[in-house]
Regions:
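Loop-helix junctions at membrane interfaces
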Residues: 1-201
Length: 201
């Protein structure tokens, strides 16, 4: 454990956590899409998290994910931390598969395969869990407000449990979000190759 968490690794955790926290917490780095409710915002804090998991391994990736979530949590208490919990859960399904595969296949091809698997698991899980777990939690807090935001965009939606919410809103939103995160990570792979290919075993 002492060998794994060297000063260089700890410094890397601090740097990537700071970058992820800035992207996650500063409103200027969050964007709304015209075809989704205002509360669904794009944020790209998973980019430094994913890069950290490639550079130092899956464990460090999860640590960075947890730390940036803890930093955000006090700002999300108005939602009882539901949004942070959801982002943490979704992030695990992106970062862990991608970094485990990359650790086994330590090449650009491995990074591509890992990111593809992480992308698919993240999009599928976030779309399903969002509809059947996260949104019902929001409904407990806000009542009908959540599904009414979708109703304003599509009057055929009469319930938060409408499957149409998933394929008309959640799936496209998650596809766009995960595509940007994965594409930027792959584009930065080569410039950061020396960092990513360090021996973290």
């Amino acid at each position: 454990m002492r060998k794994y968490f060297t000063l260089k690794t700890i410094a890397g955790i601090a740097i990537f956590t700071a970058l992820a926290a800035i992207l996650y917490c500063v409103p200027g780095f969050q964007f709304s899409l015209g075809f989704t409710p205002e509360f669904l915002k794009l944020h790209f804090d998973e980019i430094p998290v994913l890069i950290s998991s490639f550079a130092y391994g899956p464990v460090v990736g999860v640590i960075v994910l947890l730390l940036k979530s803890l930093i955000k949590l006090p700002m999300d208490m108005g939602n009882f931390g539901i949004g942070v919990l959801a982002d943490l859960f979704y992030g695990v399904f992106l970062v862990v598969p991608a970094s485990i595969i990359y650790k086994r296949i330590h090449t650009f091809k491995g990074a591509l395969i890992g990111i593809t698997v992480g992308f698919l698991s993240n999009v599928i899980i976030s779309s399903i869990v969002g509809l059947y777990t996260i949104f019902p939690l929001y409904e407990i807090v806000y009542g009908d407000y959540v599904w009414q935001q979708f109703w304003w965009l599509d009057h055929s939606i009469t319930s938060l449990y409408s499957f149409k919410i998933s394929y008309e809103f959640l799936l496209p939103f998650n596809l766009i979000r995960a595509s940007i995160v994965c594409a930027v990570t792959l584009l930065t792979y080569k410039p950061l190759k020396n960092l990513i290919n360090r021996d973290y075993n």
